[in-house]
Amino acid sequence: MPEPSVAHFYDELADDYHLIYADWDASIRRQGDALDALIGQERAAVLDCSCGIGTQAIGLALRGHRVTGSDLSPRAAARAALEAARRGLRLRTAVADMRRLPFADGQFDTVVCADNSLPHLLTERDVHAALAEMRRVLRPAGLLLVSTRPYDDLMRDRPASTLPQVHQVADVEGGERTVTFQLWHWHDGEHYDLEHFQLLPANGHWRVRVRRTTYWALGRDRLTSLAAGAGFVDLGWRMPQETGFFQPLLVARAGM
């Protein structure tokens, strides 16, 4: 999918992204704790190169890391900085394509690319370009953490939708329910168009918001191979039941 439509998808979602969580602050803490355990050092210089509204970046900042966030969506990156400030944290953010990161070589101890962000890139060439940039901005032996959906499992069934998530959210209409679900339209063997639906209460009625984007169902072996080709070593996958993170994580080190 062309770059503007991915940025547009997240610009449109930025104000309401937190509504996909039953308790966004609890998710921030939980995801930050899980990633912090994998980082395994104090006050690491961390780049979250797909920071969105800050779920992982803020969680890591709460753990004492020196976090920089970048995202293709200007509205998401701006909200991440604002949400960090509201929590008394400093989060420097930039609007950037992960294939062209505006940071110096070797600037970071850890690069995070979480929440199925990398599979917005739909070709091996683009994924390799992004991974090569992540490698470039990492110090030698720096840590890479990439999370995706469990595509090896999903490719077997090619689901047409996700189950609706119904949450009671305190900041919506005095605590009324919100509903979020997705429709998936598989248009070839491994790519799918996604429609993201949110139903929000509005004066006794439902306001429906729909955003659309495209993903590549990038399996673990293929992503591992692409990361190795971009200069990463010691590659392995850590599963949610082991890490406490909500998606499978590719864990790797920048080659010397």
Give the location of each predicted region.
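SAM-dependent methyltransferase
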Residues: 148-220
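A short acidic, Gly/Pro-enriched loop at the edge of an enzyme's catalytic core
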Residues: 99-110
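Conserved class I S-adenosyl-L-methionine
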Residues: 1-44, 55
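A short SAM/SAH-binding and catalytic strip from SAM-dependent methyltransferases
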Residues: 110-125
